[in-house]
Amino acid sequence: MVTIRLSRGGSKKRPFYQIVVADSRSPRDGRFIERVGFFNPLASGNVERVRINLDRVNHWIGNGASLSDRVASLVKEAQKAA
């Protein structure tokens, strides 16, 4: 099953997440199919907090991909802002 979820990057105590389309059986930070955005939980000031390619997310949802809980809330937030 294909899922859209967060893949952690960044350094220790400074997380940075890529929003990726991946097979649900692959490791969290392992192989992915496509990168569709990023999420920076520590963003402050003028720094961009979240960027999501909503066209690609909708394409994958149409093809049967499921969203993780956190990504679902980020997509909802991005749709409100758009």
Curated annotation (Swiss-Prot):
Keywords from the named record: Ribonucleoprotein, Ribosomal protein
A Pfam family assignment: Ribosomal_S16
Protein's UniProt name: Small ribosomal subunit protein bS16
ATP-binding listed as a keyword: no
GO biological process: translation
Molecular function GO terms recorded: structural constituent of ribosome
Recorded GO CC terms: cytoplasm; small ribosomal subunit
Gene that encodes it: rpsP
Superkingdom of source: Bacteria
HAMAP family in the record: Ribosomal_bS16 (MF_00385)
SUPFAM superfamilies assigned to the protein according to its UniProt record, in alphabetical order: Ribosomal protein S16 (SSF54565)
Family: Belongs to the bacterial ribosomal protein bS16 family.
